């Protein structure tokens, strides 16, 4: 009898968990079925290959944004951070090639990767220091620094588009292993490392604690400012790596290479279960969210829907994702008994938990 009574609440709890954490997978399955019905070419092996390869740099970038969001922040400057990394990296390679007979050795390509990650790290750290030490809102700070990076990009490039990357740089995309480009495996490695850091390390627990309640984390001995600074710095570094991967894919770069990626990653993160309030997140769900965004773009193109309509659809998805996140994280009423006097048997009252 007791087991039958407890079955109902357990079933309700399981349904609630599936609703909160499994929505992204239901949406993913629905989109695959819908676009396959609209155009059977959607589920072809060639198109699936394109979806996987075109998602790799977004997955890498998504792992970056997971740190800052789970830590309770947001970074809207990462798009132009990517542009800064890609344009300066191209100009460095071009300068080296022009002074060395047009050749760029592999060791210099490795230097470029170190440079891109380092530059992203420093730009992210700048955001983190301003937010943590001046106690400013990350949203406002990163909008401002985004404009700074944007101005620097256009100044450095003179609004030009650069193309023709060295073959050994593009090897990250052109070299295949088991039929897939190397950067797909790089994206998988980033997912594994991010999951491990956030779930199995002391730093990851600190990030979750600061994102969940910064003041409680500080009172428990966690250096909340440094955790916030490091989450921004790690986000910048990972976006720097994503910028280099994107450049290898596109075989070109400009001041517009990167902006817009922050929108895709932010939406995918929220869809995938990373709360805008911080303190919780699921990197596997984030990957599913990336595929949701890519499937929408790819499916709409195959369906012959206008490119401009995609912006409207993606905007609606972001608004819906934010609303759903707010709904999931709103305070839930609980019943507490207040006794006004000993033995008076106070009336139960509802309060927000």
Per-range role (PLM):
Residues 33-38, 42-96, 129-136, 270-280, ...:
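Single transmembrane alpha-helix segments in multi-pass membrane proteins
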Residues 40-53, 153-156, 180, 198, ...:
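Inter-helical junctions in multi-pass inner-membrane proteins, predominant
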Residues 98-145, 288:
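Alpha-helical transmembrane segments within multi-pass membrane transporters and channels
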Residues 134, 138-200, 227-230, 248-258, ...:
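Transmembrane helix-bundle core of multi-pass membrane transporters
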Residues 203-228:
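Short cytoplasmic-facing helical segments at TM-TM junctions of multi-pass membrane proteins
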């Amino acid at each position: 009898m007791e087991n039958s009574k407890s079955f109902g609440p357990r079933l309700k709890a399981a349904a609630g968990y599936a609703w909160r954490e499994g929505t992204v997978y239901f949406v993913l399955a629905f989109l695959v079925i819908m676009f396959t019905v609209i155009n059977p070419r959607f589920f072809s092996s060639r198109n699936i290959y394109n979806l996987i390869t075109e998602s790799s740099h977004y997955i890498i970038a998504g792992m970056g944004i997971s740190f800052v969001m789970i830590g309770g922040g947001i970074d809207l400057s990462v798009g132009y951070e990517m542009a800064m990394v890609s344009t300066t990296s191209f100009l460095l390679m071009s300068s080296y090639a022009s002074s060395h007979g047009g050749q760029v050795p592999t060791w210099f390509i490795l230097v470029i990767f170190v440079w891109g990650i380092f530059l992203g790290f420093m730009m992210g750290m700048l955001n983190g220091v301003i937010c943590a030490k001046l106690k400013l809102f990350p949203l406002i700070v990163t909008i401002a620094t985004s404009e700074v990076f944007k101005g620097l990009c256009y100044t450095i490039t003179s609004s030009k588009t650069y193309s023709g990357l060295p073959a050994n740089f593009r090897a990250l995309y052109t070299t295949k292993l088991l039929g897939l480009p190397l950067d797909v495996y790089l994206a998988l490695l980033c997912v594994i490392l991010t999951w491990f850091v956030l779930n199995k390390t002391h730093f990851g627990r600190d990030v979750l604690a600061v994102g969940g309640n910064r003041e409680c984390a500080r009172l428990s001995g966690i250096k909340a400012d440094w955790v916030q600074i490091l989450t921004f710095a790690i986000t910048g570094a990972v976006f720097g790596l994503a910028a280099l991967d994107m450049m290898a894919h596109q075989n070109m770069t400009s001041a517009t290479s990167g902006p817009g990626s922050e929108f895709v990653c932010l939406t995918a993160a929220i869809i995938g279960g990373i709360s805008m309030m911080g303190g919780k997140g699921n990197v596997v769900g984030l990957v599913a969210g990336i595929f949701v965004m890519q499937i929408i773009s790819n499916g709409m193109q195959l369906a012959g829907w206008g490119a401009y309509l995609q912006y409207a659809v993606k905007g609606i998805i972001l608004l819906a994702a934010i609303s759903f996140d707010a709904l999931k994280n709103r305070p839930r009423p609980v019943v507490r008994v207040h006794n006004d006097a000993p033995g008076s048997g106070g009336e139960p009252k509802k309060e927000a938990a």
